[in-house]
C-alpha cells in the first residue's frame, strides 16, 4: 500500500463513537472476547482517555478501562509463555539519533525466550526528500551493527508494508517516540489491538517543572503515555 503522508487526529465524533464501543463491549460482557480476537484497538482506549478528561471522576473511569486493557495484553503473554512459545518484541525507531534502547535490546536478543526485531518507521507530514533521508540513514545505522532489522518502506515508490507482511503484529512493542501521529499510519498505536503490550522508552529525562507547575502535566499527561503498560528512560544515574 502507498504511504499516507497526512497527519490525522481523531475527530470528536470518532472519539465519542469509539468510547461508546468500548463501553458497550464491557456492559455486554464481550470485552474479553473482542480483546482476544483483536477487534478492540488502542484507538478505543485513547478515545476513552480523551472522552473522560472533562468528566467528574473521569480519571477513575478511565483507569477502569485501562486496567482491563493491560490485563488483556499480559494474559496473552502469560498464555504464550505457558505454552512454551517465544515472545515477539518489536522496537520502533524513527531516527538513528534517537536510539535509547541499546542495552535492553541486547539483553532481550541474548535471551532465547524472546524473538526481537527492529522496525524503522518512516515519518509523515513532511516532504518525501526529508522522509527518505531520515529513513535511509536510520536503516543504515541499524543495518551496520548486527541488528535484526525489518525494512518496511520503499523510498522510491512510497510503498509501505503492513505488519502482516513482516511476520505479524508482535506481542510487545517498544516505542521510541511519543509523537505517534507523525509516523506511518499503519504503525501508529491507534491501529494496534488491545492484546498487544506497549512500552515507551523516553529519549530524555525531565527532573524539573515550570513555575506554574503546568509543564509536567503538559508533557506527561498525554494520551500516548496514558495507554502505555510501562514508561522507562535510559540513564546512567539512579535518581
Where are these regions (language model features)?
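Non-catalytic N-terminal targeting/anchoring module and adjacent flexible stem/linker
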Residues: 1-93, 110, 123
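Active-site and donor-binding regions of nucleotide-sugar-utilizing enzymes
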Residues: 9, 13, 17, 32-36, ...
Amino acid at each position: 500500500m502507498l504511504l499516507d503522508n497526512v497527519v490525522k487526529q481523531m475527530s470528536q465524533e470518532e472519539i465519542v463513537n469509539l468510547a461508546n464501543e468500548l463501553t458497550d463491549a464491557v456492559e455486554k460482557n464481550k470485552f474479553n472476547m473482542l480483546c482476544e480476537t483483536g477487534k478492540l484497538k488502542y484507538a478505543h482506549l485513547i478515545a476513552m482517555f480523551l472522552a473522560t478528561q472533562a468528566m467528574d471522576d473521569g480519571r477513575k473511569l478511565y483507569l477502569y478501562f485501562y486496567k482491563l486493557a493491560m490485563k488483556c495484553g499480559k494474559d496473552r503473554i502469560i498464555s504464550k509463555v505457558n505454552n512454551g512459545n517465544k515472545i515477539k518484541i518489536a522496537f520502533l525507531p524513527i531516527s538513528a539519533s534517537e536510539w535509547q534502547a541499546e542495552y535492553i535490546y541486547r539483553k532481550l536478543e541474548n535471551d532465547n525466550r524472546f524473538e526481537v526485531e527492529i522496525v524503522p518507521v518512516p515519518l509523515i507530514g513532511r516532504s518525501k526528500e526529508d522522509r527518505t533521508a531520515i529513513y535511509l540513514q536510520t536503516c543504515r545505522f541499524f543495518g551496520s551493527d548486527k541488528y535484526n532489522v525489518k525494512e518496511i518502506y520503499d523510498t522510491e515508490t512510497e510503498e509501505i508494508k503492513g505488519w502482516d507482511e513482516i511476520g505479524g503484529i508482535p506481542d510487545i512493542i517498544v516505542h521510541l517516540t511519543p509523537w505517534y501521529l507523525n509516523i506511518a499510519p499503519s504503525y501508529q498505536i491507534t491501529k494496534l489491538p488491545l492484546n498487544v503490550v506497549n512500552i515507551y522508552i523516553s529519549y530524555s529525562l525531565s527532573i524539573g517543572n515550570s513555575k506554574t507547575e503546568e509543564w509536567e502535566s503538559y508533557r506527561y499527561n498525554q494520551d500516548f503515555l496514558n495507554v502505555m503498560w510501562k514508561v522507562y528512560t535510559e540513564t546512567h544515574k539512579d535518581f
